[in-house]
Amino acid sequence: MMIKKYFNPSGSITIFLSISLSIIISLIFYTLESCHIDSLVARSEGITYLSLDSLFGQYCLPLFEDYGLFCLNEQGMNLENEIKKYADYNCRTPASILHNTSSFLNLTVKDVNIKKVSYITDNDASEFVKQVCDYVKYMEINSFANTLRDSSNSERPEVFTTNKEGTLELDFDSIDITKANALKKYDSNYNNPSSEDSTDTNNSDSDSGKIPSDLKDNASAYIEHIIKNGLLSFLVDNPENVSSLTTDKSVLPSVTCQLTEEGMAANLGYTKDPTKTTIEKAYFCEYIYNTFGCYLEPEKDSSLNYSMEYIIHGSDEDDTNFINCCSHIINLRLACNLAYLFSDKDKYNDAKKVAKASNILPIPGAEYLTRITILTIWAAAEALLDTRDLLSNKKVPLIKNNDTWTLELSDLTTFSKATISKNNGKNGFTYKRYLELLLATENNISLYYRTLDVIQMNICNKYNDEFRISKCVYSIQADISYLLPYLFTRKKITYKSTGSHRYR
């Protein structure tokens, strides 16, 4: 009777205990599964970004080393397959890689879907400009650091001497001797040219008067030919040495890339963003100055030798770009020289006297117009000499003074190629710096895409004929779908992870 009192034969306690244990075990399993899934989701997010970062590990090395641009060359590459390859490898745990075993943390890549790919030529090359500006900032810092390093590590030049007190002082006699020896070297080369140079000069003189047969039937081309060769023969000693290379522009970004509506309006001159004409453009012009060649520093292994001239003018011919830039420099020098003539009272009065003496007809304002014409011709003649000095690797100050001014008003009657400039060429801007001034006046859109043209031409000639900079990726956004392994459920779980990578 006592046994029946303490033991309930209905079994309600056993059922309640079983239900309680089942609920507790289910909660434990649910918690474990949730933790498992959360860890897999976090791991899949990391794998997505790691795969995209690994993809950009195949960046275009020549583009980075030569021009400081970080991009992925998409040509000959299936981006989805490349991303899937990196994702598959990163899905494996270290244990499965070493022992070829499965793991509860192993993920399986289901598919890859690329949502967006951005190229360096997109959005009016805005990303290209950003990378250039960043590159110039670091380049200036590096240049300054190198200057400090060189100045601290360089040996003392011979022009320094030690006095009785043990301190260094300048020996000006040694400085003069050093300069004299250098000048003597150049003077000997000038006064004793080689026979080959003299032969080339004679040949150039004999060939300069010849007219190509294909120009005889075209009047406009013939006139252009006469003007071009006449200006070249005055500005340079050997016009035949000016590069006549041409290139095919049909595959260049300036032709193939589509501009935005804002870019098209800006390119046509309808709109102008003042913020892009200050710091950003200064950085960009400095980048061109430090990266590309010109007439005095021609490019090697390139479709065109004169890169800066091409960026300014945009013709597919080297000589046309060169002549155009020379004309622009002449116009710039003319304006600067005219400003100096107006500021110099003696020269201005000389022009005024000649204008007054030549004014025969009593027409109001005729004397003033004659005076302005004389000053303009005077400034233009001096500008021709200035441009010739620049092409001879001399410096020319932006605003000249009486010491650097060559022509008097009476010299205009005998002005010719034989006229010798009085400018010593030690102070002022070089030819390449004048080109940089011309760059600052160019349209931004044209400047950006012509620079991309030159980069593409150079890489095509040096590394890969099929290279197209319009296929260079700087940003990518992709979705990667993963199959998550289960622990306590038979239901397959699919998780989609979205990742992106871009230049920062």
Spans of model-derived segments:
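Long, compositionally biased low-complexity segments
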Residues: L61, G68-R504
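Alpha-helical assembly-interface signal, strongest on the long, hydrophobic N-terminal helix that forms
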Residues: M2-N81
